[in-house]
Curated annotation (Swiss-Prot):
Protein family per UniProt: Belongs to the TALE/KNOX homeobox family.
Region spans: Disordered: 75-96
Cross-referenced SUPFAM superfamilies: Homeodomain-like
Subcellular location: Nucleus
Origin species: Solanum lycopersicum (Tomato)
SMART domains: ELK, HOX, KNOX1, KNOX2
Major subcellular site: nucleus
One matching Pfam family: KNOX2
Name of the gene this protein is made from: LET6
GO CC term, one of those recorded: nucleus
Segments of skewed composition (Low complexity): 79-96
Protein name in UniProt: Homeobox protein knotted-1-like LET6
UniProt keyword annotations, A-Z: DNA-binding, Homeobox, Nucleus
Length: 355
Protein backbone atom coordinates (compact mmCIF):
# COMPACT_ATOMS: atom_id res chain seq x y z
CA UNK A 1 0.00 0.00 0.00
CA UNK A 2 1.11 3.56 -0.59
CA UNK A 3 0.19 6.94 0.77
CA UNK A 4 1.55 9.80 2.83
CA UNK A 5 3.67 9.56 5.90
CA UNK A 6 2.51 7.45 8.88
CA UNK A 7 -0.38 5.00 8.38
CA UNK A 8 0.40 4.60 4.68
CA UNK A 9 -0.25 0.87 4.94
CA UNK A 10 -3.99 1.34 5.17
CA UNK A 11 -4.57 4.46 3.11
CA UNK A 12 -4.67 2.83 -0.30
CA UNK A 13 -7.57 0.59 0.81
CA UNK A 14 -9.58 3.79 1.24
CA UNK A 15 -8.66 5.26 -2.13
CA UNK A 16 -10.65 2.56 -3.93
CA UNK A 17 -13.76 4.18 -2.49
CA UNK A 18 -13.53 6.90 -5.16
CA UNK A 19 -13.51 9.71 -2.64
CA UNK A 20 -12.56 12.99 -4.43
CA UNK A 21 -12.22 11.42 -7.89
CA UNK A 22 -14.57 13.62 -9.87
CA UNK A 23 -13.65 16.32 -12.36
CA UNK A 24 -15.50 19.60 -12.57
CA UNK A 25 -15.45 21.24 -16.00
CA UNK A 26 -17.10 24.47 -14.81
CA UNK A 27 -13.97 26.65 -14.64
CA UNK A 28 -15.57 29.89 -16.01
CA UNK A 29 -17.57 30.58 -12.86
CA UNK A 30 -16.22 33.50 -10.94
CA UNK A 31 -16.68 31.65 -7.70
CA UNK A 32 -14.38 28.72 -8.56
CA UNK A 33 -14.34 25.47 -6.70
CA UNK A 34 -10.59 25.24 -6.20
CA UNK A 35 -7.67 27.46 -5.33
CA UNK A 36 -3.94 27.46 -5.69
CA UNK A 37 -3.17 25.46 -2.59
CA UNK A 38 -5.19 22.41 -3.75
CA UNK A 39 -7.88 22.58 -1.06
CA UNK A 40 -11.05 20.62 -1.83
CA UNK A 41 -14.52 22.08 -1.42
CA UNK A 42 -18.07 21.00 -2.30
CA UNK A 43 -20.15 22.35 -5.17
CA UNK A 44 -23.53 20.67 -5.65
CA UNK A 45 -22.04 17.27 -4.84
CA UNK A 46 -23.25 14.46 -7.08
CA UNK A 47 -23.78 10.93 -5.76
CA UNK A 48 -21.37 7.98 -6.02
CA UNK A 49 -21.88 4.24 -5.59
CA UNK A 50 -19.48 2.39 -3.29
CA UNK A 51 -19.07 -1.21 -2.13
CA UNK A 52 -16.74 -2.60 0.58
CA UNK A 53 -13.79 -4.72 -0.55
CA UNK A 54 -14.34 -8.36 0.47
CA UNK A 55 -11.63 -9.92 2.66
CA UNK A 56 -9.49 -12.56 0.96
CA UNK A 57 -10.59 -15.33 3.33
CA UNK A 58 -14.31 -15.24 2.54
CA UNK A 59 -16.16 -14.54 -0.69
CA UNK A 60 -19.78 -14.97 -1.72
CA UNK A 61 -20.72 -14.77 -5.37
CA UNK A 62 -24.16 -16.34 -5.11
CA UNK A 63 -26.12 -13.79 -3.09
CA UNK A 64 -26.69 -10.80 -5.32
CA UNK A 65 -29.36 -9.41 -3.06
CA UNK A 66 -26.98 -9.17 -0.08
CA UNK A 67 -24.36 -7.48 -2.24
CA UNK A 68 -26.87 -4.90 -3.42
CA UNK A 69 -27.86 -4.15 0.16
CA UNK A 70 -24.24 -3.22 0.95
CA UNK A 71 -24.12 -0.57 -1.76
CA UNK A 72 -24.00 2.97 -0.38
CA UNK A 73 -24.70 6.18 -2.25
CA UNK A 74 -22.34 8.79 -0.83
CA UNK A 75 -21.44 12.30 -1.95
CA UNK A 76 -17.92 12.65 -3.24
CA UNK A 77 -15.67 15.66 -3.47
CA UNK A 78 -15.13 17.90 -6.48
CA UNK A 79 -11.70 19.12 -7.43
CA UNK A 80 -10.49 21.73 -9.84
CA UNK A 81 -9.60 20.74 -13.39
CA UNK A 82 -6.25 22.24 -14.30
CA UNK A 83 -4.52 22.20 -17.61
CA UNK A 84 -2.36 19.19 -16.57
CA UNK A 85 -4.65 16.27 -15.62
CA UNK A 86 -1.78 14.07 -14.37
CA UNK A 87 -0.44 16.64 -11.94
CA UNK A 88 -3.96 17.53 -10.86
CA UNK A 89 -4.78 13.87 -10.08
CA UNK A 90 -1.60 13.40 -8.06
CA UNK A 91 -2.22 16.59 -6.11
CA UNK A 92 -5.86 15.70 -5.49
CA UNK A 93 -4.96 12.16 -4.38
CA UNK A 94 -2.36 13.41 -1.92
CA UNK A 95 -4.76 15.99 -0.56
CA UNK A 96 -7.53 13.40 -0.06
CA UNK A 97 -5.16 10.97 1.65
CA UNK A 98 -4.03 13.67 4.02
CA UNK A 99 -7.59 14.66 4.84
CA UNK A 100 -8.66 11.04 5.47
CA UNK A 101 -5.66 10.25 7.67
CA UNK A 102 -6.13 13.47 9.64
CA UNK A 103 -9.83 12.87 10.24
CA UNK A 104 -10.82 11.89 13.82
CA UNK A 105 -12.63 8.76 12.53
CA UNK A 106 -9.61 7.47 10.62
CA UNK A 107 -8.55 5.03 13.35
CA UNK A 108 -12.13 3.79 13.66
CA UNK A 109 -12.32 3.24 9.90
CA UNK A 110 -9.00 1.42 9.83
CA UNK A 111 -9.99 -0.79 12.78
CA UNK A 112 -13.27 -1.76 11.11
CA UNK A 113 -11.47 -2.64 7.89
CA UNK A 114 -8.80 -4.72 9.66
CA UNK A 115 -11.47 -6.55 11.67
CA UNK A 116 -12.98 -7.74 8.39
CA UNK A 117 -9.56 -8.98 7.30
CA UNK A 118 -9.06 -10.91 10.56
CA UNK A 119 -12.04 -13.21 10.00
CA UNK A 120 -10.74 -16.61 8.97
CA UNK A 121 -7.13 -15.39 8.74
CA UNK A 122 -4.21 -17.44 10.15
CA UNK A 123 -2.92 -16.48 13.62
CA UNK A 124 0.24 -14.84 12.28
CA UNK A 125 -1.80 -12.65 9.94
CA UNK A 126 -4.14 -11.67 12.78
CA UNK A 127 -1.15 -10.72 14.94
CA UNK A 128 0.26 -8.57 12.15
CA UNK A 129 -3.09 -6.82 11.63
CA UNK A 130 -3.40 -6.11 15.35
CA UNK A 131 0.10 -4.65 15.34
CA UNK A 132 -0.85 -2.34 12.48
CA UNK A 133 -4.01 -1.31 14.31
CA UNK A 134 -2.09 -0.53 17.52
CA UNK A 135 0.50 1.51 15.62
CA UNK A 136 -2.24 3.45 13.90
CA UNK A 137 -3.93 4.18 17.23
CA UNK A 138 -0.69 5.55 18.66
CA UNK A 139 -0.13 7.76 15.65
CA UNK A 140 -3.76 8.89 15.74
CA UNK A 141 -3.40 10.06 19.34
CA UNK A 142 -0.22 11.96 18.53
CA UNK A 143 -1.88 13.52 15.49
CA UNK A 144 -4.88 14.64 17.55
CA UNK A 145 -2.64 16.22 20.16
CA UNK A 146 -0.70 18.09 17.46
CA UNK A 147 -3.87 19.60 16.00
CA UNK A 148 -5.42 17.19 13.50
CA UNK A 149 -8.74 17.43 11.74
CA UNK A 150 -11.91 18.41 13.52
CA UNK A 151 -15.37 17.02 12.88
CA UNK A 152 -17.48 19.61 11.12
CA UNK A 153 -14.77 21.18 8.99
CA UNK A 154 -15.70 19.03 6.00
CA UNK A 155 -19.29 17.68 6.28
CA UNK A 156 -18.93 15.53 3.16
CA UNK A 157 -15.83 13.84 4.52
CA UNK A 158 -17.52 13.40 7.90
CA UNK A 159 -20.48 11.70 6.25
CA UNK A 160 -18.16 9.56 4.15
CA UNK A 161 -16.14 8.33 7.15
CA UNK A 162 -19.19 7.71 9.33
CA UNK A 163 -21.12 5.78 6.67
CA UNK A 164 -18.18 3.62 5.66
CA UNK A 165 -17.33 2.78 9.29
CA UNK A 166 -20.89 1.60 9.89
CA UNK A 167 -20.90 -0.38 6.66
CA UNK A 168 -17.65 -2.18 7.51
CA UNK A 169 -18.92 -2.96 11.01
CA UNK A 170 -22.08 -4.51 9.56
CA UNK A 171 -20.00 -6.39 6.99
CA UNK A 172 -17.82 -7.82 9.76
CA UNK A 173 -20.89 -9.09 11.62
CA UNK A 174 -22.25 -10.78 8.49
CA UNK A 175 -18.91 -12.49 7.87
CA UNK A 176 -18.28 -13.58 11.45
CA UNK A 177 -21.66 -15.29 11.95
CA UNK A 178 -21.21 -18.18 9.44
CA UNK A 179 -17.55 -18.48 10.42
CA UNK A 180 -18.44 -18.95 14.10
CA UNK A 181 -21.15 -21.48 13.21
CA UNK A 182 -18.65 -23.44 11.14
CA UNK A 183 -16.12 -23.45 13.99
CA UNK A 184 -18.74 -24.71 16.45
CA UNK A 185 -19.71 -27.48 14.03
CA UNK A 186 -16.09 -28.53 13.53
CA UNK A 187 -15.50 -28.56 17.29
CA UNK A 188 -18.51 -30.81 17.84
CA UNK A 189 -17.40 -33.22 15.11
CA UNK A 190 -13.89 -33.31 16.57
CA UNK A 191 -15.26 -34.22 20.00
CA UNK A 192 -17.31 -37.03 18.48
CA UNK A 193 -14.27 -38.43 16.67
CA UNK A 194 -12.24 -38.30 19.89
CA UNK A 195 -14.97 -40.17 21.71
CA UNK A 196 -14.93 -42.89 19.04
CA UNK A 197 -11.16 -43.29 18.82
CA UNK A 198 -10.01 -42.61 22.38
CA UNK A 199 -9.27 -45.87 24.24
CA UNK A 200 -9.24 -46.20 28.06
CA UNK A 201 -5.80 -45.43 29.47
CA UNK A 202 -6.08 -47.35 32.71
CA UNK A 203 -7.87 -50.24 34.34
CA UNK A 204 -9.89 -47.74 36.36
CA UNK A 205 -11.30 -46.20 33.21
CA UNK A 206 -11.98 -49.67 31.81
CA UNK A 207 -13.95 -50.63 34.90
CA UNK A 208 -15.74 -47.32 34.67
CA UNK A 209 -16.71 -48.06 31.07
CA UNK A 210 -18.14 -51.44 32.13
CA UNK A 211 -20.15 -49.78 34.88
CA UNK A 212 -21.52 -47.31 32.39
CA UNK A 213 -22.54 -50.15 30.07
CA UNK A 214 -24.46 -51.79 32.92
CA UNK A 215 -26.07 -48.69 34.37
CA UNK A 216 -26.37 -46.54 31.26
CA UNK A 217 -24.99 -43.44 33.01
CA UNK A 218 -22.28 -41.01 31.93
CA UNK A 219 -21.79 -39.16 35.25
CA UNK A 220 -18.65 -41.09 36.13
CA UNK A 221 -17.06 -40.34 32.77
CA UNK A 222 -17.59 -36.62 33.22
CA UNK A 223 -15.77 -36.80 36.56
CA UNK A 224 -12.82 -38.74 35.16
CA UNK A 225 -12.33 -36.95 31.87
CA UNK A 226 -13.82 -33.48 31.46
CA UNK A 227 -12.11 -32.84 28.14
CA UNK A 228 -14.98 -34.32 26.12
CA UNK A 229 -18.54 -35.58 26.49
CA UNK A 230 -19.35 -39.08 25.30
CA UNK A 231 -22.01 -38.73 22.57
CA UNK A 232 -23.09 -42.36 23.13
CA UNK A 233 -23.93 -41.90 26.82
CA UNK A 234 -27.56 -41.12 26.06
CA UNK A 235 -27.87 -44.25 23.89
CA UNK A 236 -26.41 -46.44 26.63
CA UNK A 237 -28.74 -44.94 29.21
CA UNK A 238 -31.75 -45.65 27.03
CA UNK A 239 -30.52 -49.18 26.41
CA UNK A 240 -30.15 -49.79 30.15
CA UNK A 241 -33.65 -48.52 30.85
CA UNK A 242 -35.16 -50.75 28.18
CA UNK A 243 -33.30 -53.81 29.46
CA UNK A 244 -34.41 -53.20 33.03
CA UNK A 245 -38.02 -52.72 31.94
CA UNK A 246 -38.36 -55.59 29.46
CA UNK A 247 -35.76 -58.10 30.68
CA UNK A 248 -38.43 -60.52 31.98
CA UNK A 249 -40.41 -60.37 28.78
CA UNK A 250 -37.27 -60.92 26.72
CA UNK A 251 -36.37 -63.91 28.89
CA UNK A 252 -39.75 -65.53 28.29
CA UNK A 253 -39.43 -64.91 24.57
CA UNK A 254 -36.03 -66.57 24.63
CA UNK A 255 -37.41 -69.63 26.39
CA UNK A 256 -40.28 -69.87 23.95
CA UNK A 257 -37.87 -69.58 21.07
CA UNK A 258 -35.73 -72.37 22.51
CA UNK A 259 -38.80 -74.57 22.83
CA UNK A 260 -39.65 -74.00 19.21
CA UNK A 261 -36.12 -74.95 18.25
CA UNK A 262 -36.46 -78.16 20.26
CA UNK A 263 -39.52 -79.11 18.25
CA UNK A 264 -37.31 -79.66 15.26
CA UNK A 265 -34.73 -82.40 14.88
CA UNK A 266 -33.70 -83.91 18.20
CA UNK A 267 -30.07 -83.87 19.30
CA UNK A 268 -28.03 -86.80 18.09
CA UNK A 269 -27.15 -88.16 21.54
CA UNK A 270 -30.73 -87.95 22.81
CA UNK A 271 -32.05 -89.65 19.72
CA UNK A 272 -29.49 -92.44 20.11
CA UNK A 273 -30.66 -93.13 23.67
CA UNK A 274 -34.26 -93.35 22.50
CA UNK A 275 -33.26 -95.72 19.71
CA UNK A 276 -31.39 -97.93 22.19
CA UNK A 277 -34.47 -98.14 24.41
CA UNK A 278 -36.57 -98.88 21.33
CA UNK A 279 -34.36 -101.80 20.30
CA UNK A 280 -34.43 -103.26 23.80
CA UNK A 281 -38.25 -103.13 23.89
CA UNK A 282 -39.00 -103.76 20.23
CA UNK A 283 -41.70 -106.32 21.06
CA UNK A 284 -43.70 -103.81 23.04
CA UNK A 285 -42.33 -100.25 22.61
CA UNK A 286 -44.71 -98.53 25.01
CA UNK A 287 -42.68 -96.89 27.81
CA UNK A 288 -44.35 -96.36 31.14
CA UNK A 289 -44.60 -92.96 32.80
CA UNK A 290 -41.64 -93.70 35.05
CA UNK A 291 -39.61 -94.82 32.04
CA UNK A 292 -40.57 -91.64 30.19
CA UNK A 293 -39.39 -89.55 33.12
CA UNK A 294 -36.11 -91.45 33.21
CA UNK A 295 -35.62 -90.96 29.48
CA UNK A 296 -36.44 -87.25 29.77
CA UNK A 297 -33.86 -86.83 32.52
CA UNK A 298 -31.13 -88.70 30.64
CA UNK A 299 -31.73 -87.09 27.25
CA UNK A 300 -32.59 -83.55 28.35
CA UNK A 301 -35.87 -83.63 26.46
CA UNK A 302 -39.30 -82.93 27.84
CA UNK A 303 -41.98 -85.60 28.14
CA UNK A 304 -43.97 -84.25 25.23
CA UNK A 305 -41.02 -84.66 22.89
CA UNK A 306 -40.52 -88.24 24.07
CA UNK A 307 -44.18 -89.09 23.55
CA UNK A 308 -44.14 -87.63 20.04
CA UNK A 309 -40.96 -89.52 19.16
CA UNK A 310 -42.38 -92.88 20.24
CA UNK A 311 -45.68 -92.23 18.45
CA UNK A 312 -43.90 -91.41 15.20
CA UNK A 313 -41.48 -94.29 15.64
CA UNK A 314 -44.27 -96.82 16.12
CA UNK A 315 -46.16 -95.53 13.08
CA UNK A 316 -43.12 -95.79 10.84
CA UNK A 317 -41.11 -98.73 12.11
CA UNK A 318 -43.28 -101.07 14.22
CA UNK A 319 -46.10 -103.45 13.43
CA UNK A 320 -47.43 -105.64 16.22
CA UNK A 321 -47.39 -109.43 15.74
CA UNK A 322 -50.54 -111.55 15.81
CA UNK A 323 -50.15 -112.24 19.53
CA UNK A 324 -49.67 -108.54 20.18
CA UNK A 325 -52.73 -107.70 18.09
CA UNK A 326 -54.83 -109.94 20.34
CA UNK A 327 -53.39 -108.24 23.39
CA UNK A 328 -54.18 -104.86 21.91
CA UNK A 329 -57.72 -105.96 21.12
CA UNK A 330 -58.16 -107.22 24.69
CA UNK A 331 -56.79 -103.98 25.98
CA UNK A 332 -59.34 -102.03 23.97
CA UNK A 333 -62.20 -103.92 25.69
CA UNK A 334 -60.95 -105.09 29.07
CA UNK A 335 -64.43 -105.55 30.53
CA UNK A 336 -65.07 -108.34 28.00
CA UNK A 337 -61.90 -110.34 28.60
CA UNK A 338 -60.74 -109.43 32.14
CA UNK A 339 -62.31 -109.83 35.51
CA UNK A 340 -60.54 -106.77 36.90
CA UNK A 341 -61.79 -103.86 34.81
CA UNK A 342 -59.46 -101.50 36.67
CA UNK A 343 -56.41 -103.43 35.61
CA UNK A 344 -53.86 -101.65 33.43
CA UNK A 345 -53.82 -102.75 29.80
CA UNK A 346 -50.06 -102.83 29.65
CA UNK A 347 -48.18 -104.43 32.55
CA UNK A 348 -45.11 -102.24 31.97
CA UNK A 349 -47.20 -99.10 32.56
CA UNK A 350 -48.71 -100.34 35.82
CA UNK A 351 -48.12 -98.15 38.83
CA UNK A 352 -47.32 -99.64 42.25
CA UNK A 353 -50.81 -98.78 43.51
CA UNK A 354 -52.38 -101.03 40.87
CA UNK A 355 -50.08 -104.00 41.37
Amino acid sequence: MEGGSSGNTSTSCLMMMGYGDHENNNNNNGNGNGNGNGNVTICAPPMMMMMPPPPPSLTNNNNAETSNNNILFLPFMDNNNNNNPQEDNNSSSSSIKSKIMAHPHYHRLLTAYLNCQKIGAPPEVVARLEEICATSATMGRSSSSSGGGIIGEDPALDQFMEAYCEMLTKYEQELSKPFKEAMVFLSRIECQFKALTLAPNSSHESALGEAMDRNGSSDEEVDVNNSFIDPQAEDRELKGQLLRKYSGYLGSLKQEFMKKRKKGKLPKEARQQLVDWWLRHIKWPYPSESQKLALAESTGLDQKQINNWFINQRKRHWKPSEDMQFVVMDAAHPHYYMDNVLANHFPMDMTPSLL
